[in-house]
Each structure stands twice: as C-alpha cells, then as structure tokens.
Amino acid sequence: IALHYAVQLTRVNWGHLSDKTQNRTQWIIFGMLFLGIGGILASISIPLIESRFAQGILLAVFSYSLIGFGVGAAGTPLLALLASYSSKSQKGFAASITFLMMILGLAITGITVGIILDPYSHQKLIQITSSLAAITNIISFLSLRNLEKSLQNSSYTPNGKAISSNVSFIEGVKKVWMEREARLFTIFIFISMGAFSMQDPILEPFAGEVFGFAVGESTKLDGFHKIGTLI
C-alpha cells in the first residue's frame, strides 16, 4: 500500500511533462491504462503469493508501482487541465467538484464491489478488477475525447503559458518552491492527504481481525467510510 503512494512522488514530473507538451489528454489516458493494468496484476499476485511466494511478491511490487505511476500520470495532468481552462474565480469550485466526484466514485465502487465480492474467491477478485479496469478506461477515453481540442478551439483562453523546453524539471521545481504560497499549500496538502489516506492500512485489516469481517464486508465498510468523508 505504501509503495504506490511513494511512487506518486513522480506526480510533479508528470505535471511538468504535461506543461511542456500542452497535451494533457495523452498523459491522462496513458495513466489510466497503467492504473488498470496495475490493478489487474495486483489481483493476480494474491493467489501467486500463496503458491510461489517470491514470484508473487515481485509481481505485487511491480503492479503497485504501475498503480502509483498510473495515478500520478492521470491525476496531475487532469488537475492541470482543469486549472488551465478555469477562471480564477472558478478554480476552487472546479477543484471541489472534482474531488467530491472522486470520493463519490470511491464510495460507490467500494460498496458495489463489496456486495459482489461475497463470497470471496481469487478468481472473482480478478474478474471484478479486470471489469473495473475496462469500464474506467472506456469512460475516461469517451469523456476526454476531443475535449481538450474543443477547449483550445473555443473562446476559452488557457491560464498560463507552456513551459519552455529549455526549462529543466529541477529548475521548474525551484521556481515554484520560491513562492511562499506554493510552499504553504504543499504543507497543507501533505497533512490533509496523510490524514485522508491513513485509514487505508488500518480500517479494513482492523475490521477483519477484530470484528471478523469478510473481505467483501470490509470493502463495503471502506465505501461507507468514503460516504462519511463526502458528507
């Protein structure tokens, strides 16, 4: 669980690359594809660990790395796309809607998958993960199709200019870090995301070990937790 968060430290680099190319869509689709593949491989690694421990652990490490890269490659350019075509007065509202939709999606997915997953089997988990990967990638592709191009051709004016190809990643980070507001916001995000994600390694194992919840039941519990967060 910690690995895919650690890999997401590359988010800054994904944002830098999308700034330089000014084609956010390709990075979002690329990230979603990696995320889907990583999720499928992660579910496959579970039964493999039981039969071939070393190979299963290697596959799990690889798959969770893919998940981290996928989340970073899709999420950061998406937020950049949102910021580019939102006016200054709309940025906060647009970001709020985006994160509310994310939490709502997590809640619906957690409860739905929890219901379907009982009684648990490795094969059922792989089937559910594969189906979710296909559905989310199709929805993402259809949602983004021609969106950025239509915004570029419309009256919307992107906020900010493309980063010069001569500006390196390190130079870009240094320039941003020199801004006091950027530093304070980074600290705020660090604390808030730490609090939001802290339940991941605690809630579901605790429900299983202390209350004897099955896998599907603890997954539903996580979905209800997200509903509480949403409210």
Predicted regions and their residues:
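Glycine-rich segments within core transmembrane alpha-helices of 12-TM secondary carriers
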Residues: 4-11, 92-117
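Pair of pore-lining "gating" transmembrane helices in MFS-fold secondary transporters
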Residues: 1, 65, 177-199
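Cytoplasmic helix-loop-helix junction between adjacent transmembrane helices
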Residues: 65-100
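Symmetry-related core transmembrane helices of the 12-TM Major Facilitator Superfamily/SLC fold
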Residues: 124-143
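C-terminal ends and interior cores of transmembrane alpha-helices
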Residues: 30-54
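Juxtamembrane intracellular "pre-TM" segments in multi-pass secondary transporters
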Residues: 151-186, 210
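Central cavity-lining transmembrane alpha-helices of secondary-active solute carriers
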Residues: 1-19, 37, 223-231
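Short amphipathic helix-loop junctions that connect adjacent transmembrane helices
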Residues: 1, 201-220
